[in-house]
Regions:
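Terminal alpha-helical anchor/extension segments at protein ends
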Residues: 1-373
């Protein structure tokens, strides 16, 4: 996962003047009958944040963003400081845990875990006369597209003779033309959002015709949904979640295999990988980490130390003071790790629960030396 979208957040680090970040993950799902529940949930979160030291102007700024969310919005992540919201992200699912936190650094780990579940894709519910598409980008701003094909002739009849053969041929041609039209719109939509895969549902013949008409690159990323249902229906959602999990796991296992191959090399100079929090911090401080693999434990309260630069990260304040950081500050280790990875353009990969993790659940793969690049 690339973390560049977080840089605007870290440009407003709260350590400089002692103020901090308000981080809120809120379930905003509601209907007309339960609209007040969102307000009650926010009121409870606000009380916790105020007790932790968050200022009124920042809490008011968050309140303005929390209220008035549309009923279909399952959840919201908001990060604010100094009376202003620095980043707001709609969530595709209700947050697993509603979190309210006030600290020097924003608490972004739950957001990244939610984004891990969101791989950009396109859903296609095809019929002989057209299709309904749903584009699902990473940012959660889904959009529906209607493809209208030729409406006649699309049904075969048994009349016999020459006229029947002509009609049958016309029907076949209409099906093929409509499938090509659907495929063209699908390919454009996939390119627009950088889709990793395309789900195609509908009757077996229609699915096959659309998939066969897709450009090769999109066709290779097509997954069938054996149901004739709208693209926002449960079968499509289940298929999207399964394909997302499969792809994420494949990416993470590939990184982990690479890490294992490197860390096991006999010559330390050839390993180009480190493990453990201290090792990962050292690689990030030096700008050597290409990617970080992590098995996150949501219940972990391990802390670490940071400084004014994004890459200032260490397991002890003494380490940073030895590097010239005059006033290190303490925060959760995962918050400091993500900040350092973002600041040095390192990618982040979450390891599946059944993977054998590096020491302390954290490893870093190092960039190739400049002479080898």
């Amino acid at each position: 996962m690339k973390l560049g979208f977080l840089k605007r957040l870290y440009q407003a680090d709260g350590y400089r003047d002692g103020s901090g970040f308000v981080s809120v993950y809120l379930d905003t799902s509601h209907n007309e009958a339960t609209r007040k529940e969102v307000g009650l949930r926010w009121r409870a979160a606000r009380s916790e944040l105020a007790e932790a030291g968050a200022d009124e102007s920042t809490l008011n700024a968050v309140a303005d963003h929390v209220t008035g969310q549309p009923p279909h919005q399952p959840g919201l992540a908001v990060f604010a400081r100094d009376g202003a919201v620095r980043l707001e992200m709609p969530l595709l699912w209700r947050p697993r845990d509603e979190v309210s936190r006030y600290a020097a650094l924003p608490h972004v780990m739950p957001l990244l875990e939610e984004l891990e579940r969101a791989v950009p894709h396109v859903r296609v519910s095809a019929s002989r006369t057209g299709a309904q598409l749903l584009t699902c980008p990473e940012n959660g701003n889904e959009a529906q597209i209607t493809v209208e094909g030729e409406q006649w002739p699309v049904h075969k009849v048994s009349r016999g003779g020459w006229s029947e053969r002509n009609l049958q041929r016309s029907v076949e041609e209409t099906w093929a033309e409509n499938a090509k039209r659907i495929a063209d719109v699908t390919a454009d939509a996939a390119q627009d959002i950088g889709a990793a895969f395309v789900l195609v549902g509908g009757d077996e013949r229609e699915r096959t015709a659309v998939i066969d008409a897709l450009p090769e690159a999109v066709r290779e990323a097509a997954v069938t949904v054996d149901r004739e249902v709208p693209p926002d229906a449960a079968p499509f959602t289940a298929a999207a979640e399964a394909e997302t999990a499969r792809r994420r796991a494949a990416e993470s296992y590939a990184r982990l295999d690479d890490f294992r191959a490197r860390i096991s090399r006999a010559d330390p100079g050839e390993r180009r990988a480190v493990e453990g929090l201290d090792g990962a911090f050292g690689a990030l401080r030096a700008g050597l980490a290409d990617s970080v693999v992590i098995r996150h434990n949501p219940s972990s309260v391990q802390s670490a130390w940071a400084g004014p630069q994004l890459a200032d990260a260490a397991v002890s304040a003494e380490q940073l003071r030895g590097l010239g950081v005059e006033q290190p500050f303490r925060d959760q280790a995962d918050a400091i790790l993500i900040r350092a990875a973002c600041g040095t353009d390192a990618e982040l990969f979450f390891l599946p629960d059944d993977a054998d993790p590096p020491a302390a659940g954290i490893g870093a793969l190092l960039r190739a030396p400049a002479s080898a690049a």
